[in-house]
Regions:
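Short alpha-helix capping/helix-loop boundary micro-motifs
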Residues: 69-75
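Mature exported/compartmentalized surface modules and terminal targeting/interaction regions
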Residues: 1, 62, 79, 87, ...
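Long, compositionally biased stretches
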Residues: 1-62, 76-103, 160
């Protein structure tokens, strides 16, 4: 697949700096769901998971987004509000997800589930992590961890009934859709 080049504005949603791909750039990706990419921002290299923005209804233009970390932003001399030059190339080499501490602890207490966790692909681990983090309350999150352990103990390699095209990060989404920067500003002022 060829390199996808574009310019995009960095937005702040809540306290996170977000880069949302233009729809025409997102269209060139191999998947509407999460996609692993290598690329550059203002010439500074990175590798990350692109999350879907959750827009998929008729008439909507779906896209992807990611949260550049502080080091990448500093090295690229970029901040929220700036327009940056981005080059992306999809890759099949998936980086490991950051496993939340509560899930690490639960896996460590369940050797059978942990053994399967270590055997599944990084993509499958991303599915589990995204499914677990996609909830807002601690009680529901714990329920998702308990269900994940039960399924892993039964040999199930992926969560069931999880739409990979939705935005699974509750801090920057509402009803599984990435919050628009204007909505984030309106929420903060009301």
């Amino acid at each position: 697949m060829s390199t996808i080049d574009f310019e995009a504005k960095l937005y702040e949603i809540n306290s996170w700096t977000i880069l949302r791909l233009p729809e025409d750039a997102s269209e060139k990706l191999p998947s509407r769901g999460m996609t692993m990419v290598s690329g550059t921002i203002n010439g500074v290299p990175f590798k990350t998971l692109l999350e879907p923005d959750g827009r998929y209804a008729p008439g909507q233009k779906p896209s992807h987004w990611f949260r550049p970390d502080k080091t990448l932003l500093d090295d690229a001399s970029a901040k929220a509000g700036d327009t940056v030059h981005v080059s992306l190339e999809p890759t099949k080499d998936w980086i490991e997800p950051e496993v939340p501490e509560d899930l690490k602890k639960a896996l460590a207490a369940s050797p059978k589930a942990e053994a399967l966790w270590n055997d599944i692909t990084p993509l499958a681990r991303w599915d589990w992590v995204r499914w677990i983090r996609a909830v807002k309350t601690p009680a529901t999150r714990q329920k998702h961890i308990d269900v994940a352990l039960d399924k892993l103990n039964k040999g199930m390699r992926r969560p069931c009934c999880f739409n990979r095209n939705l935005c699974s990060e509750p801090y920057v989404s509402h009803n599984w859709v990435l919050i628009e920067p204007m909505q984030a500003t309106e929420k903060m002022t009301t």
